[in-house]
Amino acid sequence: MVKQVFNFNAGPSALPKPALERAQKELLNFNDTQMSVMELSHRSQSYEEVHEQAQNLLRELLQIPNDYQILFLQGGASLQFTMLPMNLLTKGTIGNYVLTGSWSEKALKEAKLLGETHIAASTKANSYQSIPDFSEFQLNENDAYLHITSNNTIYGTQYQNFPEINHAPLIADMSSDILSRPLKVNQFGMIYAGAQKNLGPSGVTVVIVKKDLLNTKVEQVPTMLQYATHIKSDSLYNTPPTFSIYMLRNVLDWIKDLGGAEAIAKQNEEKAKIIYDTIDESNGFYVGHAEKGSRSLMNVTFNLRNEELNQQFLAKAKEQGFVGLNGHRSVGGCRASIYNAVPIDACIALRELMIQFKENA
C-alpha cells in the first residue's frame, strides 16, 4: 500500500492542505450556525459574508481595480467560450483568437457559431510548442476583442508576458495559471478561469470583467447568459455553487498567508526549475515538448526516448505513489501539473524518481 501520494493531476488538482483542514473542521458547524456551509441559504448573512470575503480576497491578491467586477459563475471556462461571443461579438465586429492549443481551438469553435471570427496567430504548425511572437498578431480595426489562453495545459506552454493592445479589449482564459504570479489586471477587458486548477475545487468559474464592457443588456441573449444579469445581481441571480465559493475563499486565504501572488510566483518558479533542470540535464533521455522560451510554470510536459519507456516510467511512478503524470490523451507522453497547491517536496520527489529511472533504464 502506498504511504504517500504525490498529486500531479491536471484538474481537478491538488488543494492546499490548510484549506481542506479548515473545511473539515467547519463541515458540520459553520460559524456556530449548527449547519454545514452547504446547507446555508445563499440569501443568508452567513453565506453572503463568505461570498463577499472571497471577492475581497481575490481583489486584494490580484490588485483588481474598482472599475472591474468579480463574478462567480457556473459552467466552467467552456461556457465562457459561448458567453463571451454571445455578449460581445455583435454584427459588423470580429472575434479575434490566438491559437496556442486545444482550449483556444475550442473557444474559437464556439465563437464561429455566433459571428465572424479571425485567427490572429497560431502555433499549430509546430505542434503548439511555443507562444507566437506578438509582432505576428494580425489585428483588425473592427475586432470585438482579442482572445488568448494564457497557459496551455496539454502542451505545457505559457505566455511569459501579455500583448498591450488599444484597439479592442484583451480577453484571457486563465483557467490554469490565474494567481500563479502577479498580474496587471487593467491590461485586460476580461479574465475568466475555472477554479479547479489554482483556485479551488470544480464548480465555480471566476470572471473578472471591466464594468463598462459587459454591463449592458444584450438583445436576443437569454437572461442567464448575459454578463449584465450577474453583474447587476452580484452573482446571486440564481443559487451559486456555495460550497465551491467557500473553498475558493479558503484557498485565497491560504495564498494570502503565504505572502500573496509574488510569494506564490517565487515558489512556482522554484518548483518548475527542479523538473525542467532534470529534463535538460538528462542528455536527451527526457525531452520537453515546449520550447524553452514558452515553458509553462504550471504544466511540465515531456517524453522519454520511446513509447515503451514512457509506459514503463508511468508504471513505476504509479507504483511509488505519483498520481496524474500521464500526458493528455490527445498527445500522450508525460505531464507534471504543478499548480499552486502542489508542494515543492512533490517536485523534489519527482526529480529523484526521474534520475533513478534513467540510471536503471
Curated annotation (Swiss-Prot):
Modified residues (N6-(pyridoxal phosphate)lysine): 197
Reactions this protein catalyses: O-phospho-L-serine + 2-oxoglutarate = 3-phosphooxypyruvate + L-glutamate; 4-(phosphooxy)-L-threonine + 2-oxoglutarate = (R)-3-hydroxy-2-oxo-4-phosphooxybutanoate + L-glutamate
Residues where L-glutamate binds: 43
UniProt remark on cofactor binding: Binds 1 pyridoxal phosphate per subunit.
Residues bound to pyridoxal 5'-phosphate: 77-78, 103, 153, 173, 196, 238-239
A UniProt-annotated Pfam family: Aminotran_5
Record pathway: Amino-acid biosynthesis; L-serine biosynthesis; L-serine from 3-phospho-D-glycerate: step 2/3
GO biological process, one term: L-serine biosynthetic process
Major localization class: cytoplasm
Gene3D superfamilies: Aspartate Aminotransferase, domain 1 (3.90.1150.10), Type I PLP-dependent aspartate aminotransferase-like (Major domain) (3.40.640.10)
Intracellular or extracellular location(s): Cytoplasm
Cofactor(s), names only, from the UniProt record: pyridoxal 5'-phosphate
Subunit text: Homodimer.
Official protein name in the record: Phosphoserine aminotransferase
Lineage of producing organism: Bacteria, Bacillati, Bacillota, Bacilli, Bacillales
